[in-house]
């Protein structure tokens, strides 16, 4: 699978959208050479103040770029 960590203290939820888009690209590249990736591990960047907003943005991006059979692991980091 693929893992990304946006980083603690992220201030722009679009950084998660970009990370999901980049992950989709990696999944597609892997498929082109015969790998069937099944896991996406997302993490970092969430704080108590931004958790709700960032989680909603991340959820929307995951729905747009990944089918339901992909296993998503979320590691929010320090909250």
UniProtKB/Swiss-Prot annotation:
Pathway linked to the protein: Amine and polyamine biosynthesis; putrescine biosynthesis via L-ornithine pathway; putrescine from L-ornithine: step 1/1
Keywords tagged on the record: Cytoplasm, Decarboxylase, Lyase, Polyamine biosynthesis, Pyridoxal phosphate
Subcellular location: Cytoplasm
GO molecular function: ornithine decarboxylase activity
Biological process (GO), any one: putrescine biosynthetic process from arginine, via ornithine
Reaction(s) catalysed (UniProt annotation): L-ornithine + H(+) = putrescine + CO2
Site-annotated residues for Stacks against the aromatic ring of pyridoxal phosphate and stabilizes reaction intermediates: 5
Domain of life per record: Eukaryota
Residues where pyridoxal 5'-phosphate binds: 8, 45, 75-78
Presence of keyword Oxidoreductase: no
Family as reported in the entry's similarity comment: Belongs to the Orn/Lys/Arg decarboxylase class-II family.
PANTHER family (UniProt xref): ARGININE/DIAMINOPIMELATE/ORNITHINE DECARBOXYLASE (PTHR11482), ORNITHINE DECARBOXYLASE 1-RELATED (PTHR11482:SF6)
Its biological purpose: Catalyzes the first and rate-limiting step of polyamine biosynthesis that converts ornithine into putrescine, which is the precursor for the polyamines, spermidine and spermine. Polyamines are essential for cell proliferation and are implicated in cellular processes, ranging from DNA replication to apoptosis.
Quaternary organization: Homodimer. Only the dimer is catalytically active, as the active sites are constructed of residues from both monomers.
Name listed for the protein in its UniProt record: Ornithine decarboxylase
Encoding gene, per UniProt annotation: ODC
